[in-house]
Structures are given as structure tokens and as C-alpha cells.
Amino acid sequence: MQKQPLWQRSRREVSRLNPAHRVNIAEVAATAGVSVGTVSRVLNESPNVSEKTRGRVMEVMKRLNYRPSRSAESLSRGQTRTVVILVPFLTRPSVAERLAGAIGVLDEEGFDSVVRNVESADQRDRHLAALTARHEADGAVVVSLRLSDSRLADLRTAGVPLAMVDAEAPGVPCTVVDDIRGGSLATEHLLALGHRRIGFIGDSPDDDLGFISTRRRLLGYRRTLARHRISYDPAIVRLGPHSASVAASMARDLLGLPEPPTAIFAASDTQALGVLAAAEKSGHSVPDDLSVVGYDDIESAAQLGLSTVHQPLGESGACGASRLCALIRGQLVRPLREELPLSMVTRTSSAMYAVAGVA
């Protein structure tokens, strides 16, 4: 009796020594007597396979009860099912919330997330160069980082799909907020409470990563003062490295002035927390002696009663990731610029000027 060809045997016959074994693409290829590439082309419905071979491979897949894994399908399409997320200073609460939003969407879409922390321009450029030099991911989400024209050109040439969050670049889908308006919201809130001497604490303008959020929030602050015919006073503006401890030091400096501000607008909640700590240490009651407003509305802001400008951090990360997934699927993303709304959240750290006990 002639021996039955291997490719015509059932899965039970092929896998009887290990009933729990899941058949993979290599076993299909070996059983059908073809290469893995041929099986991949059959899965991908390529026309470059003869009908006879296609039929044999399909018969083997049926007999072995083969079910393509997600990774096998991805490889057949030249995909890694991986997305790189570039974020600056991962430990910052606002960054962590954006990141969580992005990872949640990517996970639902079946992508693994590779997070690259960036703390210098050199780090940023190395990670971007890796994206263009080798196909390590199907695309990238860039959070709060500015990209040079040359780096953008490299990414486009390499065909790397890209979406940005809290940053913009020509021709790239981006998810942003209007930080000028945000600065205005915070300043208007304090002016409505009767404050006229409002200090400002924010980031240094000369960081090598090119962050622009503080500059835009400061611009909103200045424009709002001008609309109310209040002169901008650089003596009550302090800019420095982004941290609660540095902000606390700058706040102590402001509170020690002969004419200290009655309110301080901090360009981030992290910096506002430093202001609150400095006020407590120097014996200034918040909000009786000093009103404080932050920006971001991170999770701890509500717990501490911090008045702040709310921006949808998690939603922004999710939106950026969703737009990238659309690009990877080959869909047209419009509009390129998605602006999310801001709102002023009033809590116990801000109060009327008269209530603050200043005559």
C-alpha cells in the first residue's frame, strides 16, 4: 500500500505526540513541502503562487486546523505590530498621564508599545535615527518634542508613520491644546478674583529640547494683563528648570519681595505644588495670603485642592495613538490638527483678593 503524502495527513496524525501543540507556519510549510515564504504569500493572497501550490497549502492548513497568529499575519504584511512612543522626562505626572492614554489605545488595537524616555536633544535624535535605520516599529507617537526639518525628512523618506501629541510639525497629524488661551484662562480667573499683582513661574526658555508650552502660557498671561491695562512686571516672573523644588525656590524669592504678588500662576501643576510648599514653609496661608493656580490638572491636583487649567492629558495621548493607528492602516487622517478643549477648574487654592487679607 502506497504511503500517504505528509501533506495529506490529518492534524491528529502530525501532532499525536503533543495534542496541545499549536501548529505554526513553519510546520505548515514543511508539511506542504514548500517554503515559509510561499505559505506567507498564500496567507497574503499573493498572485505569485500557482493554483496547484495554493490548493495544497490551503488543504494542509485545513487538515492541520492551522490558525494564523497575529504575529504571522503581521510578518506576512511586513509589520511588527509595535509602536514606539517618544516621551520627555517620563517621571513627570503630565507625561505619564498622556502615555497611559496612548498605551491604552495601542493595546486595544493590538500593538505593543515601546517607550523611549528622552531627556536631551541627543537622546531624541538617537531614538529617531534608530526608527529610520531599521524597521523596529510600524510607527511612532512623539509627545511634547519638537522635530527638526531634516529629521522629519528622514522619517518621511524611511516611510515611518508619525503622529504628534502636544507638539506640531508640517504635514504630521497632531493633537494639541491652545496654551495661549490656557494662560489667559488662568490669568482671567485671578483677575476676576480681584488680584492685580500676579506672579508667574515657568520653565526656562533655553532648554535644548525646545519646549514651547511655557512661552505660550506666558504669552497668554501677558496678553490678558494688557487687555486689562495692567503693566507686565518682569520682577514678578521667574523661569527655571522644571521641578517642584526649583519652583519652590522661585516662589520663596517672589514672596520675599518688598511688594510680593498676591497670586501666582504656575505654568504646570508640578511647579504649582512647589509654590504651595514654599508658601507653607514661609508662613503664607493659601488662599488667605496667596492664591495659587496651576496648569494640567494632574491626578494629585484635586487631592490638594489646587485650582488649575484642565487639559485632557489622557485623552490627548489616546487621540494621538488612534490617529497613528489610522495612518498605519493606510487611512487618510483629517484634520491634521486636532485641538482639544481647555477649562478652568476652581478649587480651594484661589480666593478673592479681599478674602486674602490684603488691604
Model-derived features with residue positions:
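Short acidic/histidine-rich motifs immediately flanking catalytic phosphotransfer sites
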Residues: A133-G139, L257-T262
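Bacterial carbohydrate/catabolite-sensing allosteric modules
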Residues: M1-N18, R63, G104-E109, T157-M164, ...
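N-terminal helix-turn-helix DNA-binding module of bacterial transcription factors
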Residues: M1-R81, A354-A359
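Short beta->alpha connector loops
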Residues: Y66, E119-D122, V143-S148, E168, ...
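Short beta-strand segments enriched in small/hydrophobic residues
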Residues: V36-S40, L75-L90, R197-D207
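Active-site-adjacent beta->alpha loops and helix N-cap segments on the catalytic face
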Residues: L147-G159
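Amphipathic helical "hinge" segments at domain boundaries
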Residues: E51, G55, L64-A129, E136-G139, ...
